[in-house]
From Swiss-Prot:
Biological classification of the source: Bacteria, Bacillati, Bacillota, Clostridia, Eubacteriales
Molecular function GO labels: 16S rRNA (adenine(1518)-N(6)/adenine(1519)-N(6))-dimethyltransferase activity; RNA binding
Main subcellular location of this protein, as a coarse class: cytoplasm
UniProt organism field: Clostridium acetobutylicum (strain ATCC 824 / DSM 792 / JCM 1419 / IAM 19013 / LMG 5710 / NBRC 13948 / NRRL B-527 / VKM B-1787 / 2291 / W)
UniProt-listed NCBIfam families: ksgA
Record's function text: Specifically dimethylates two adjacent adenosines (A1518 and A1519) in the loop of a conserved hairpin near the 3'-end of 16S rRNA in the 30S particle. May play a critical role in biogenesis of 30S subunits.
Gene responsible for this protein: rsmA
Binding positions for S-adenosyl-L-methionine per the UniProt entry: 24, 26, 51, 72, 97, 118
Protein name per the record: Ribosomal RNA small subunit methyltransferase A
């Protein structure tokens, strides 16, 4: 593989970073190699990359995968990455906002699909939510995100980071924390640490619930009023006190507990009893 230096490419094209788009390009080759290694890319994999920047990670992906499709929002990066990747016939570039993309149109008939990306901090949670909630056929997501968000995704019950995002991700995926990435590994340097994590999609959700929408409504209610007891938090579901009391009793959950103490299995039991 050719030497491909992020700083050199940025200087070559006199690229100007956009604060609005949260652009921080990874320059550390060890971190780049760790991302690719932990993505476990096979020669028949179809890789989707969100926010390729100047293509530092992209090139490594192209050397290993069958195809790479990159989605980039910044119009000023389109000619740069197009020119830098012109030697690869297994590369496709889409100029669009990843939050507006129907990934099924990109995936098509591909069977082994993985997402690998250095996600902009400001859209991390919306993108993860979209990718998981809309049921796309990804085997895994290997992503670099703000450490604060990564800590929330990997959190355990009864910790300060445990919340609705934790349960959304762990409902659909196994979570592996790969490594911490320091600000010095980027240009320009962000103000906080980053985290590389890998999310492996489960064949079926971690818990089987009768009504998925209700399940997530129960979770949101519990964490919208995090410091309140479950009894007070669930009042927003507009159930009678009698029905709510029956649901807690049938689920075997003390209504004086707080949402942050419940496991995903307990949230499943509670939502199923409320559904009755």
């Amino acid at each position: 593989m050719k030497e491909f230096n992020t700083r050199q490419i940025v200087e070559k094209y006199n690229f100007r970073f956009s604060k609005r788009l949260g652009q921080n390009f990874l320059t550390d080759n060890t971190v780049l190699d760790d991302i690719v290694e932990n993505a476990e890319i096979q020669k028949d994999d179809f890789i989707i990359e969100i926010g390729p920047g100047v293509g530092t990670l992209t090139r490594r992906l192209l050397e290993k995968a069958k195809k790479v499709c990159a989605i980039e929002l910044d119009e000023s990066l389109i000619p740069i990455i197009t020119n830098e990747m012109k030697e690869y016939d297994n590369f496709t570039l889409i100029h669009n906002d990843a939050l507006k993309v129907d990934f099924n149109n990109i995936i098509g008939e591909e069977q082994s699909v993985k997402l690998v990306a250095n996600l902009p901090y400001y859209v991390t949670t919306p993108i993860i939510s979209k990718l998981l909630n809309e049921g796309y056929n990804f085997k895994s997501l290997t992503i670099m995100i703000q450490k604060e968000v990564g800590d929330r995704i990997a959190a355990k019950p009864s910790t300060k980071d445990y919340g609705a995002l934790t349960l959304l991700v762990q409902y659909y995926c196994d979570v592996k924390v790969v490594r911490v990435v320091k600000p010095s590994c980027f240009i320009p340097q962000p103000k906080v640490d980053s985290l590389v994590i890998r999310l492996d999609k489960l064949e079926k959700p971690r818990v089987q619930v009768k009504d998925e929408k209700l399940f997530f409504n129960v979770i949101r209610s519990a964490f919208n009023m995090r410091r309140k007891t479950l009894w007070n938090a669930m009042k927003g579901l507009k159930l009678s006190s009698e029905d709510l009391e029956k649901a807690f009793e049938a689920a075997g959950i003390d209504s004086k507990r707080r949402g942050e103490t419940l496991s995903i299995e307990e949230f499943g039991k509670l939502s199923d009893e409320i559904y009755r």
